[in-house]
Each structure stands twice: as structure tokens, then as C-alpha cells.
């Protein structure tokens, strides 16, 4: 998945915002909280996608070649996809959507309603 495809997909999710920070990283948020990042963090010389995941997904994904605990964020169960061969674009989109849902669920009910994540 290219950075442009990553950004386009993240933009399509409900109530997302984007900021470019930390040396040019594309940081996507819901309710002001980060759920995914496309960056050059780590040893690979290309954009890598990092995202929040469930405990189970974290364990499974970290066993795959080309997926590592995300630099600076691993303790919060984030992974970084460093290889285009490990996961399909659809797989990555599914994990990004799950990351969005995980972070959105941590917002207050009022925030969720205000952002259109829950019925009014």
C-alpha cells in the first residue's frame, strides 16, 4: 500500500483527522487520538504502516515476517508493517479499520455521538 493509498483510505473512515508530524509521518486520529501512522521510523528505508491492534492480533502479527512491534508504541500493542509481501492491502485496511474502532471506543460516549460514531 502506498502512502497516498494509505491516506485516502484513512480519510474515508468516520471522523478522522490527519496531521503530518514527527519528521514527515502521516498521523491519523479519531477524536484527537492516534490510531495509525505511516512513517519512516525504524531500520527500513521506506514508508511503513503502524497501527494499534488487539492483544491477540498483536501476538499473531508479531510472529509474521515483515511485521514488528512498532517503534515507540509497542508497549501499547502497536505493530509496524515493514514488508509489502506480508499482508495484502485489504488485510492492512481491515487492521486499520479495527484500530480506528479500538481508539474510537475509548472516547467518551458524548465524543462518540458528537463525531457521528454513535447515533445521536
Model-derived features: positions:
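Charge-dense, helix-prone N-terminal extensions
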Residues: 1-120
Amino acid at each position: 500500500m502506498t502512502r497516498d493509498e494509505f491516506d485516502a483510505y484513512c480519510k474515508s473512515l468516520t471522523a478522522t483527522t490527519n496531521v503530518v508530524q514527527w519528521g514527515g509521518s502521516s498521523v491519523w486520529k479519531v477524536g484527537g487520538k492516534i490510531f495509525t501512522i505511516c512513517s519512516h521510523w525504524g531500520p527500513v528505508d521506506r514508508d511503513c504502516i503502524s497501527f494499534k491492534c488487539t492483544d491477540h492480533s498483536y501476538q499473531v502479527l508479531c510472529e509474521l515476517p515483515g511485521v514488528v512491534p512498532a517503534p515507540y508504541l509497542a508497549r501499547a500493542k502497536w505493530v509496524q508493517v515493514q514488508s509489502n509481501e506480508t499482508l495484502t492491502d485489504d488485510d492492512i485496511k481491515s487492521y486499520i479499520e479495527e484500530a480506528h474502532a479500538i481508539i474510537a471506543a475509548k472516547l467518551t460516549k458524548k465524543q462518540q455521538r458528537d463525531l457521528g460514531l454513535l447515533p445521536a
